[in-house]
Design a protein with these regions (language model features):
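The Walker A/P-loop phosphate-binding site
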Residues: 1-93, 314
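Conserved catalytic network of the ASCE P-loop NTPase/AAA+ motor domain
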Residues: 35-36, 65-67, 107-110, 131-136, ...
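Conserved inter-motif catalytic segment of the P-loop NTP-binding fold
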Residues: 67-160, 291-292, 299-305, 314
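Cofactor-binding loop segments of dinucleotide-utilizing enzymes, especially the Rossmann-like FAD-
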Residues: 76, 181, 228
């Protein structure tokens, strides 16, 4: 099908007049580099055991509570209960052991309005995961990790999947994040810091270290690298976010500079802090806080959050 001539005029005029809508942020420094946008295919890269999934869960939780986005998650290496345990702890801002049974059950019911999980007891083909995403009706999908799928392990096979995933987001409007691992070369001696305070520690993988080749980076919209110095006595509590690709900077986001990642402080496991800002803080439940909506009925904070969650940010 050929597109009509002139059908891009309104977009061009909006660009000229500064009316292009920005991607969704978290109201912290991370927004300068990373924005959520609909209809995108995004890649996440990082070494094993640096906390990629943990950071992704925090990021998704914050987007859900702030913007009402809904997520469909396939996590081949983590159980649903483990993910929800971490999310509830972040949401409450308290360690899980300090929560009552009633708090846990209430928070579970609330958060499951935003998060749907795909059964990981089955080995899925890529097209089966995409079908589950569509069935969920969610705004966002996560494949974690790509290497856990029943797939053709070849460069051509990776391109075929990325092309199908690209067509899926274009037609469906969903945004998909794909969590990936780097190749073996990225973990060898040549990728260690050679001097200074970080001597001997493993560097973050380069964009082109992604296992399976450049088919992923060539076909994705945005790409970020998650890294952590897991053996450093101080830096092991800091997660680095390096934004390596932003396809459309007009709608927000930009590359992080070399050696200047966005630093996310672990914050004792109750939700990351970035430059002293805890993006989850405004959305944590406060049983004493009540609000009066326009119709004069009393509305608890939790009810207000549920109401806001049903509003479409786009």
């Amino acid at each position: 099908m050929l597109l009509k001539q002139g059908d891009s005029l309104q977009y061009l005029l909006d660009v000229r007049d500064g009316k292009i809508k920005q991607g969704l942020g978290l109201d912290c420094f991370l927004d300068e580099h990373l924005r959520f946008k609909p209809k995108q295919l995004n890649i996440i890269l990082g070494h094993d055991n640096v906390g990629k999934t943990y950071w992704i869960n925090w990021y998704f939780l914050t987007l859900a509570l702030k913007h009402g986005l809904t997520f469909c998650i396939w996590s081949g290496e983590n159980q649903k209960g483990q993910i929800l345990r971490d999310m509830i702890q972040m949401y409450r801002g308290k360690h899980f052991s300090k929560l009552s049974h009633n708090q846990i059950s209430g928070d579970l019911a609330y958060l499951e309005q935003f998060f749907t999980f795909i059964d990981n007891s089955k080995l899925y083909k890529p097209e089966e995961i995409l079908a589950q995403f569509e069935k969920s009706g969610c705004k966002v999908g996560l494949i974690d990790p790509f290497t856990g799928l029943d797939r053709e392990m070849s460069f051509a096979g990776n391109y075929e999947f990325m092309n199908k995933a690209r067509q899926f987001v274009n037609q469906n409007g969903m945004t998909i994040y794909i969590n990936t691992h780097p190749n073996s070369e990225s973990g060898r001696g040549g990728n260690l810091y050679a001097e200074g305070e970080l001597k001997g520690h493993l560097k973050a993988p380069l964009k082109d270290h992604i296992e399976g080749g450049k088919s992923f980076t060539n076909r994705c919209d945005d790409m970020l690298v998650i890294h952590r110095l897991i053996k450093h006595p101080e830096h092991k509590y800091k997660t680095w976010i390096q934004v390596e690709k932003v396809k459309d900077m007009e709608t927000g986001g930009k590359h992080t500079e070399m050696d200047f990642p966005v630093i996310c402080e672990f914050n004792s496991g109750i939700g990351f802090q970035i430059n002293g800002v805890d993006p989850l803080a405004p959305f944590r439940p406060n049983e004493k806080q009540m609000t009066i909506p326009k119709d004069g009925q009393i509305e608890s904070t939790s009810d207000k959050l549920r109401r806001l969650a049903n509003q479409n940010p786009f």
